Amino acid sequence: MKKNNQESLSVIGHAIVSSNFCIADSQGNMPEELKSEVDWKMFQSDLDNSDLVILGRKSFEKYQSSKRFRLVATASLSSFLKQEEIIFFNPNDISIKQILTTLDLCPKKIAIAGGRLVYELVFKDLFYTEFHLSIKTNFIMPNGVPVLNRVENITQFIQRMRENNMIQSQELVLDKDTIQLRFVRV
């Protein structure tokens, strides 16, 4: 990875949510109804064009075969463990910034693939330059896992973005049941 300073770092969050802003069902699984082929292709393209992907353990376990350079948040170890293209880390022991500094990693583009704890961690430890939020307008997940703490609707999501110096910049229609809202840092 090339050296860079924080001003040129791009950190893009990606999430697809139900109309009540959940990313998973009550068991922590992503139901088929939450998927959008157009969103998936856009998401995969952005991950492919990123220097580093940050994700949680559940997402990693589901998509282990990826050849992308990944930083995986997990509570199952102390500090961090580097293995070729994967770095496992315990966010209770070491921050994202500390890992990047300790391992002399200087990505220009970081993609955030979730889940909720990872999204929150980036707000706490780093920052977002963009957030791409896809919404399945025809699907509700009662008792699901919210995308962010204390966010159950668009008003609360927009407020959370504003609190972190982000505003909505674009709205795209991905398919008949899915829109994507893009937020940028101001």
Located regions from the model:
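Enzymes that bind and transform nitrogen-containing heteroaromatic metabolites
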Residues: 1-186
